[in-house]
A protein has these predicted regions:
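Active-site-proximal beta-alpha core segment in soluble small-molecule metabolic enzymes
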Residues: 2, 6-9, 30-165
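Positively charged, low-complexity intrinsically disordered leader regions
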Residues: 3-25
Length: 165
């Protein structure tokens, strides 16, 4: 007898129930961001985002600009944060689609600021910290605080949060 092919059954009700349980535990005053990068880990980012949006999930995290734009073009209105690197040629999409970008150095924020000024819009960002995993991010140092202050003073930049990943 030949073994059966592997398949995955995506149960959106179960996904929603699990996220709702987490949201109930942290309380209504806490905003929850569901990480749905890489097509929601193969579960389908668009249907997962739509279902989670309906139950009150505040925001979504993705890996790339392309993933974020797909969500926007599919009608997702929730805030979207790109957790990884974004190529400069994609900055206009981030700004036009109001997608947040993870920033971990001044020169990236400056380039986003320049593009936002050119477009007459605001670029939304989160500051990414490296809290010990050795991944990309600003170190928790006095120098980083000064760099964040410089980023804060840039025109057409809106810092929406700080996170680690």
């Amino acid at each position: 007898m030949l073994p059966q092919r592997v398949y995955a059954k995506i149960d959106l009700d179960a996904i929603c129930r699990n996220i709702k349980n987490a949201m109930d535990k942290v309380g209504k005053e806490t905003k929850v961001m569901a990480i749905i990068k890489t097509d929601a880990y193969g579960h389908g980012a668009v249907p997962v985002a739509k279902a989670l949006s309906e139950i009150g999930c505040y925001a979504f995290g993705v890996a790339t600009a392309k993933e974020a734009v797909v969500l926007r073009k599919s009608g997702i209105k929730n805030p979207i944060l790109i957790l990884g690197y974004v190529f400069p040629q994609d900055y206009d999409d981030l700004i036009n689609y109001e997608i947040m970008h993870a920033v971990f150095e001044y020169h990236t924020a400056k380039a986003l600021s320049d593009e936002a000024v050119k477009l007459g819009k605001t670029a939304k960002i989160h500051i990414k910290l490296d809290t010990g995993m050795g991944r990309i991010g600003m170190q928790p140092t006095d120098e980083s605080i000064e760099e964040i202050k410089k980023i804060y003073s840039l025109p057409n930049i809106e810092i929406n949060g700080i996170f680690t990943h």
